[in-house]
UniProtKB/Swiss-Prot annotation:
Keywords: Carbohydrate metabolism, Isomerase, NADP. PANTHER family: ADP-L-GLYCERO-D-MANNO-HEPTOSE-6-EPIMERASE, NUCLEOSIDE-DIPHOSPHATE-SUGAR EPIMERASE. It holds the Pfam family Epimerase. The gene is hldD. This is ADP-L-glycero-D-manno-heptose-6-epimerase. It catalyses: ADP-D-glycero-beta-D-manno-heptose = ADP-L-glycero-beta-D-manno-heptose. Homopentamer. The lineage of its organism: Bacteria, Pseudomonadati, Pseudomonadota, Betaproteobacteria, Rhodocyclales. NCBIfam families: heptose_epim. Binds 1 NADP(+) per subunit.
Amino acid sequence: MIIVTGGAGFIGSNIVQGLNARGITDILVVDDLTDGHKCLNLADADIHDYMDKDDFLRRVEANEDFGPVEAIFHEGACSSTTEWDGRFVMAVNYEYTKSLLGWAVARKVPLLYASSASVYGMGPTFRESREFEHPLNMYAYSKFLFDCHLRRFAPGIDSQVVGLRYFNVYGPREQHKGSMASVAYHFHNQLNDSGRLRLFEGADGYGPGEQQRDFIHVDDVVAVNLWLLDNPGVRGIFNVGTGRAQSFNEVAHAALSWHKGSTAGGGIDYIAFPEHLRGRYQSYTQADITALRQAGYEGEFMPVEVGVPRYLEWLALRD
């Protein structure tokens, strides 16, 4: 059996789809379906069972078994970068993951967990090393602290444990995330609603819409996860991005190009940069994927010119 925590969420449900594509259906999905809309992410998936995350955590902390477990993909977390309830974030993102690590290591079960590029703060270097890590919010700090925890104990661990520092992921099954969904998702909806896009004006020395992020399609994220499943000797913390920064304007133009002829207008409106985000906003990210390549991963990554149209095709079938 393979366990996927956060399996009804964005990346988790796509990992389930990726496993299904391999013919793997002996999957235990762990999640919190308080927001029942997330069940739609699993409506076309084949799984063995579902378990509420609180029940799962109680069983993990009680050191109970779940039968033979091949691997754990730990994607469950509070992913809101604007959540400042530190006790809540630390309980969900840090303590939960520590408990799961102890359970997995004791049984030599591979644990592949979601970290985040947010640990790097404002950058400008995005490499998996302590001197470049400067988290700016509770979410980032919780991810950073667990990465530090792993580093302390890694020398004594003889099973696979991998932290994946996801950069700006976009793609299918993120609709439940609301304001935290990708700009590609919001651009699609804006064009459907009004035919125009809204982007922030310039900040931190960047012109209007010229802030840059490393945007990675969720299919590429899944490919990295499945490669790690196939390569249990690979361990450590790795950036998962394309290795190329692209501007929000480039994402916007990819969306506009796809929508061309199907919507009225098609312009971009630049809006004032929010004051509450100044000093807390990553205006530039670009994954250094040297470590991932050196570990042996050879897969190619989609630029936004390819990934965004692919995603919008998927969304259009469900509009």
